[in-house]
Amino acid sequence: EYTRLISLSDPDPKGSKHYQSFWDITRASLRYALARLGLVHTSANEDALMAQYAQLTAFPENLGVLQALRHRGVATAILSNGSPEMLQSAVHSAGMSDLLDAVLSVDSVRQFKTTPTSYQLVQDHFGFAPADVLFVSSNAWDALGATWFGFTTLWINRQGLPPEAIGPAPQHTGRDLSEVLKVLG
């Protein structure tokens, strides 16, 4: 919610007036959630929770799928609202460092997804036409934004959630990342 509030409220088209790093937004969101739930927390507990967030692990099939894509010569990348430092830590802890061609952060454009400028980072980096990109996300809102941008989209819907009630549905939906291999044939 905070990323959208910042992106929508910033009067500067370059996103420089209200922009904060995703790490700072994540910390602010944690503080808000704890306060809303009436949970007492200390800075030590907050730091411990944030450290956990920085060491995310991959879902069981992810490394195998990325290895298969690497073997096929398919370019792979992450486009994230996360800051470069967050992404570097997460990619390393998940064991994906050697399996990605690029790790792209919206930090460089100071606008969060779902702004078109954020999705343009993929096109600028790889030079592919949007329709030639298979954009994969576990977030329905992100798949919708990418669909509107013109990417071919795959929504990884692990929890069986309903699709967004506005806009076009993603072109593909699957339960886990192995669906990428099916979509690409």
Where are these regions (language model features)?
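Asp-based, Mg2+/Mn2+-dependent phosphohydrolase catalytic module
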Residues: Q67, S83-P84, Q88-G185
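A metal-dependent, Asp-based hydrolase signature
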Residues: T3-D47
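Short amphipathic alpha-helical segments at helix boundaries and their inter-helical linkers
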Residues: I6-S16, Q55-G64, T152
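A short, structure-level motif marking secondary-structure boundaries and short turns
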Residues: K14-K17, L49-Q52, H71-G73, V103-S105, ...
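A general structural motif at alpha-helix termini
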Residues: E1-Y2, L49-Y53, S137
